[in-house]
Curated annotation (Swiss-Prot):
Cellular component, GO annotation: chloroplast
Gene null: resulting phenotype: Defective in anther dehiscence and pollen maturation. Delayed flower buds opening.
Annotated EC: 3.1.1.32
pH dependence: Optimum pH is 6.0-6.5.
GO molecular function: galactolipase activity; phospholipase A1 activity
Comment field (misc): Directly regulated at the transcription level by the floral homeotic gene AGAMOUS.
Catalytically driven reaction(s): a 1,2-diacyl-sn-glycero-3-phosphocholine + H2O = a 2-acyl-sn-glycero-3-phosphocholine + a fatty acid + H(+); 1-hexadecanoyl-2-(9Z,12Z-octadecadienoyl)-sn-glycero-3-phosphocholine + H2O = 2-(9Z,12Z-octadecadienoyl)-sn-glycero-3-phosphocholine + hexadecanoate + H(+)
Leading EC class: hydrolase
InterPro entries named in the record: AB_hydrolase_fold (IPR029058), Fungal_lipase-type (IPR002921)
Organism: Arabidopsis thaliana
Keyword Nucleus set for record: no
UniProt motif (GXSXG) ranges: 293-297
PANTHER family linked: PHOSPHOLIPASE A(1) DAD1, CHLOROPLASTIC, PHOSPHOLIPASE A1-IBETA2, CHLOROPLASTIC
Name of the protein: Phospholipase A(1) DAD1, chloroplastic
Name of encoding gene: DAD1
Length: 447
């Protein structure tokens, strides 16, 4: 590791007629391609002297700037140089207490974990063949053994165990046979399952982690599935009378459910088979399942989390970390997720319109008790409105960011606000609601 320090020697002359002034010394350091700056306030000498004040030894500066359990040059929001071990509180960081006290200000450990899982989604995008003129369009560009390494995660400590495909359930008209083949691609590679194998990483995390990563919308039929925005009942789901007194029952967006359940060997089947195999192999040790995705992948991640907790009665802790996801289901579906213990952390950009669709939401979750904005209506009308196939509910805990807070985003447009790299940039820069963007953010957007 290369470390350089360049202290600025303070002046040693003191004017007797003026009150004592503290001397401020600026120390800049560079560690692992990360720049940081510390400010040390030193008491001024009581009398004028030809010798400069005694500065702390360089190793003292290094101890202030470096910490083996923190990103170099970064301090906790409380100002403490003593890091919090991730492994000791891993369930808390996975949402056991719904991330209470970790989001505002954003805990440094949680920030790093969000960014780390975001990189798994980035790798899913990198591995997908987007070229419609390619004979391998819609497939994974890399073999399973080298996918993580070739898609930007060479030292993740994870091993890819399963490739995942999603199939559209849309019935194509006959005339589609004359259209380009890419328009009729019904089944395409959408992500993967990977398991942590590195002993040091397992020790750092405090458990063995299974990650399921989903990319966002890519194919023509996936876009069409996104437009099927009406709510539909979950297959084999509980009745609404058992959940919140509603007759509608848990419902989710039709297109998302179609992509998850369609096909002779559906995405749902693949996820279930692989999770069953991994539970058989690692079920006797601390284990977590973290499902992450962007855009369409965020919605699919939520459905997969629900399905895993429903299918496996002794399922490990299941957490969703989603980026820029659309709405997925109704209030009854949200209640079902909460009841089964599924934890969902939604990273939302206030300027991203995708997070505001589909349908409408008739509630405000800023308070502990859900408050219906339509409370002026008679209760029976409210119930009827909620049971319509267009009324959705926000699911999980929300980390709300804004493109307008970043000094690196000169303009606000729909495409930029929804991009995954914008989300990761905003997560890296966010401090708190009172300090929305830090100057030391590492992820600067390059355009």
């Amino acid at each position: 590791m290369r470390f350089s320090l360049s202290p600025v020697r303070p002046h040693s002359v003191v004017v007797p007629s003026l009150p004592k002034q503290d001397v401020v010394s600026y120390i800049s350091g560079t560690t692992s391609n990360r720049q940081c700056r510390c400010v040390l306030t030193l008491p001024s000498p009581s009398v004028s002297t030809s010798r400069p004040p005694v500065l702390p030894k360089p190793e003292t500066w290094e101890s202030l700037l470096l910490n083996h359990d923190q990103i170099p040059g970064e301090f906790s929001p409380t100002g403490s140089s003593i890091p919090v071990k991730l492994g000791r509180r891993w369930m808390e960081y996975q949402g056991l207490q719904n991330w209470d006290g970790l989001l505002d200000p954003l805990d440094d450990n949680l920030r790093r974990e969000i960014l780390r899982y975001g990189q798994f989604v980035e790798s899913a995008y990198q591995a997908f063949d987007f070229d419609p003129s390619s004979p391998t369009y819609g497939t994974c560009r890399f073999p399973r053994s080298t996918l993580l390494e070739r898609s930007g995660l060479p030292n993740s400590g994870y091993r890819l165990t399963k490739n995942l495909r999603a199939t559209s359930g849309i019935n194509l008209p006959r005339w589609i046979e004359k259209a380009p083949s890419w328009m009729a691609t019904q089944s395409s590679w959408i992500g993967y399952v990977a398991v942590c194998q590195d002993k040091e990483e397992i020790s750092r995390l405090g458990r063995r982690d299974v990650v399921i990563s989903f990319r966002g919308t890519a194919t023509c039929l996936e876009w069409l599935e996104n437009l099927r925005a009406t709510l539909t009942h979950l297959p084999n789901g509980p009745t609404g009378a058992n959940l919140n007194g509603s007759n509608s029952g848990p419902m989710v967006e039709s297109g998302f459910l179609s992509l998850y359940t369609s096909g002779v060997h559906s995405l749902r089947d693949m996820v279930r088979e692989e999770i069953a195999r991994l539970l058989q192999s690692y079920g006797d040790e601390p284990l977590s399942v973290t499902i992450t995705g962007h855009s369409l992948g965020a919605a699919i991640a939520t459905l997969a989390a629900y399905d895993i907790k429903t299918t496996f009665k002794r399922a490990p802790m299941v957490t969703v970390i989603s980026f820029g996801g659309p709405r997925v289901g109704n209030r009854c579906f949200r209640k079902l997720l909460e009841k089964q213990g599924t934890k969902v952390l939604r990273i939302v950009n206030s300027d991203d319109v995708i997070t505001k669709v589909p349908g409408v939401v008739l509630e405000n979750r800023e308070q502990d008790n859900v408050k219906m904005t339509a409370s002026i209506m008679p209760s029976w009308i409210q119930r009827r409105v909620e049971e319509t196939p267009w009324v959705y509910a926000e699911i999980g805990k929300e980390l709300r960011l804004s493109s307008r807070d970043s000094p690196h985003l000169s303009s606000i447009n729909v495409a930029t606000c929804h991009e995954l790299k914008t989300y990761l940039h905003l997560v890296d820069g966010f401090v708190s609601s009172t300090c929305p963007f830090r100057e030391t953010a590492r992820r600067v957007l390059h355009r």
